[in-house]
């Protein structure tokens, strides 16, 4: 993962952890957890691509990796919709900036995961 993407994940996770969204803080914690999970998954795909011979290992280790990939895309789409919803309802500029950056990062990571997965197919 390039250093910009790593710092973007770290920055957004830090910003989200500082937000207090009242009754929806449980939802925010869920979003943070999914962001962290997405980062780990993206990193593991990148590592597999870097070691192209690792495709067989990836398939052997997880025979359902395509299903897992599909699930990650569903999670990304859910996060994108959740972030868009938060953008519409928040009036706090700190939160707006954070969610705009989160949305941009999600779109970038979705594209990276697509690129990695096509290289693995």
UniProtKB/Swiss-Prot annotation:
**Chief subcellular location:** virion
- Name the InterPro entries for this protein: Flu_NS2
Per UniProt, subcellular location reads as: Virion; Host nucleus
Q: Where is this motif: Nuclear export signal?
A: 12-21, 85-94
Gene Ontology terms: cellular component:
host cell nucleus; virion component
Example GO BP: exit of virus from host cell nucleus through nuclear pore
The protein's matches in Pfam families, at most eight in alphabetical order, are given as: Flu_NS2
Q: Which UniProt keywords apply?
A: Host nucleus, Host-virus interaction, Transport, Virion
Residues passing through the membrane, by range: none
Q: Which family does it belong to?
A: Belongs to the influenza viruses NEP family.
Relate the protein's function as given in its record: Mediates the nuclear export of encapsidated genomic RNAs (ribonucleoproteins, RNPs). Acts as an adapter between viral RNPs complexes and the nuclear export machinery of the cell. Possesses no intrinsic RNA-binding activity, but includes a C-terminal M1-binding domain. This domain is believed to allow recognition of RNPs bound to the protein M1.
What's the subunit arrangement here? Interacts with protein M1. May interact with host nucleoporin RAB/HRB and exportin XPO1/CRM1.
Name the UniProt record assigns to this protein: Nuclear export protein
What is the originating organism of this protein?
A: Influenza A virus (strain A/Duck/Czechoslovakia/1956 H4N6)
């Amino acid at each position: 993962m390039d250093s910009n993407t790593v710092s973007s994940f770290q920055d957004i996770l830090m910003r989200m952890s500082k937000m207090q969204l009242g009754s929806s803080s449980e939802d925010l914690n869920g979003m943070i957890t999914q962001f962290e999970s997405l980062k780990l998954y993206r990193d593991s795909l990148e590592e597999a691509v870097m070691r192209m011979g690792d495709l067989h290992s990836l398939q052997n280790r997880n025979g359902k990796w395509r299903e897992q990939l599909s699930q990650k895309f569903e999670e990304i789409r859910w996060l994108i919709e959740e972030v868009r919803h938060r953008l519409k309802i928040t009036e706090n500029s700190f939160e707006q900036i954070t969610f705009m950056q989160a949305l941009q990062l999600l779109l970038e990571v979705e594209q990276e995961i697509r690129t990695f997965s096509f290289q693995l197919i």
